[in-house]
Amino acid sequence: MPHQQILMLFGLLPVATNISTWWNFGSMLLTCSALQIMTGFFLSMHYTANINLAFSSIVHVVRDVPHGWMMQNLHAIGASMFFICVYIHVARGLYYGSYLNKETWLSGTTLLIMLMATAFFGYVLPWGQMSFWAATVITNLLTAIPYLGTTMTTWLWGGFAINDPTLTRFFALHFILPFGIISLSSLHIMLLHEEGSSNPLGTNSDIDKIPFHPYHTYKDLFMISSMIMIMLLTISFIPDIFNDPENFSEANPLVTPQHIKPEWYFLFAYGILRSIPNKLGGALALAMSIMILLTVPFTHTANTRSMTFRPFMQLMFWTLVATFMIITWTATKPVEPPYTMISQVTSSLYFMFFMSNPIVGWLENKIMKTQL
């Protein structure tokens, strides 16, 4: 709408008075992406995409480059902070019914897929033991695709095994994808401002709005400052909290780590993958764990938008949060009982939330009608 665009130019965009702190994570994500692009740019100046030099180039950045340790840690901790904010942002969208703004939700889910791909390519670049073996395990899943799988895997690797061409193309992809993320983020924000943000009540907030500036700008700045402070405290005192000890050893194709696992933010999807004993089934479940978010706007049957007044859905939502955490925890454990059974049960519960969403909505409508 032209009227809204003029208001945006002067920072007068009207926003609902009752939006809570959960609405601040969008601006925090923009800050994260800006930080990641800046630190990544400086790191790329010193990085060498060669299997014999990649690991040494990271060591060189940390030891010899002025403030290189800070750049490297900011980039690594920044990725974790990015995913913490993303998962909270998605959870808020699910809880408050923001997914009913279909275009914004679908562009956001596409952004999440692009972000996960970028993070995966980035995890391979240091060429440590876990980087190499995580890349081998995850890319090998393509071989599960009937007929085309082996050809696609060879094409992705640039050979018959993960080697120098693989690292070179992963670096190229890791460099180019963030620009796609920035472009899609712009589209995501434009689509959001076509309709405007929802609010915790899930009602139309046209009746009661305030200008975005100064109220929400200061609130955003406070949350961004808090996030940066947490990041700086983490890189100063516990910089390796999210790192795997195996990744401090250079990649060796002849030595397999005892327990192969990706970064913590992929563990829920990896846990779902591991819970299914069939390779193709596991690969499909892995893809569906993210793709199922695309179905949410089309399966909403409740008359109420937000979960604020939906106790049954609240129970299901917090069960989803608990299952997400339990799957993440089981993915860090060996593939043996009782962990396999726990991950199978929690994976089923994860998908059950999305499948039972329309049924619960329909039941709630029935209960509301009988009470009226």
Curated annotation (Swiss-Prot):
The UniProt similarity line reads: Belongs to the cytochrome b family.
Annotated GO molecular function terms are: metal ion binding; ubiquinol-cytochrome-c reductase activity
Q: Name one GO biological process term.
A: mitochondrial electron transport, ubiquinol to cytochrome c
Q: Which PANTHER family match?
A: CYTOCHROME B (PTHR19271:SF16)
- The UniProt transmembrane annotation reads 25-45, 69-90, 105-125, 170-190, 218-238, 280-300, 312-332, 339-358
Protein name (record): Cytochrome b
Q: What does this protein do?
A: Component of the ubiquinol-cytochrome c reductase complex (complex III or cytochrome b-c1 complex) that is part of the mitochondrial respiratory chain. The b-c1 complex mediates electron transfer from ubiquinol to cytochrome c. Contributes to the generation of a proton gradient across the mitochondrial membrane that is then used for ATP synthesis.
The organism's taxonomy opens as:
Eukaryota, Metazoa, Chordata, Craniata, Vertebrata
> Which residues does heme b b562 bind?
H75, H174
Query: Chief localization class?
Result: mitochondrion
As recorded in Swiss-Prot or TrEMBL, the protein's gene is named: MT-CYB
Report the membrane topology from the UniProt record: Multi-pass membrane protein
- Species of the source: Acrantophis madagascariensis (Madagascar ground boa)
Q: How is the cofactor bound?
A: Binds 2 heme b groups non-covalently.
Cofactor(s) this protein requires: heme b
Give the GO cellular component terms, alphabetically.
mitochondrial inner membrane; respiratory chain complex III
Say yes or no: keyword Transport present.
yes
Q: Cite any additional comment in the entry.
A: Heme 1 (or BL or b562) is low-potential and absorbs at about 562 nm, and heme 2 (or BH or b566) is high-potential and absorbs at about 566 nm.
Q: Which sites bind a ubiquinone?
A: H193
Task: Enumerate the subcellular locations listed in this protein's record, separating them with semicolons.
Answer: Mitochondrion inner membrane
Key words, A-Z: Electron transport, Heme, Iron, Membrane, Metal-binding, Mitochondrion, Mitochondrion inner membrane, Respiratory chain, Transmembrane, Transmembrane helix, Transport, Ubiquinone
Record note on quaternary structure: The cytochrome bc1 complex contains 3 respiratory subunits (MT-CYB, CYC1 and UQCRFS1), 2 core proteins (UQCRC1 and UQCRC2) and probably 6 low-molecular weight proteins.
Q: Which residues bind heme b b566?
A: H89, H188
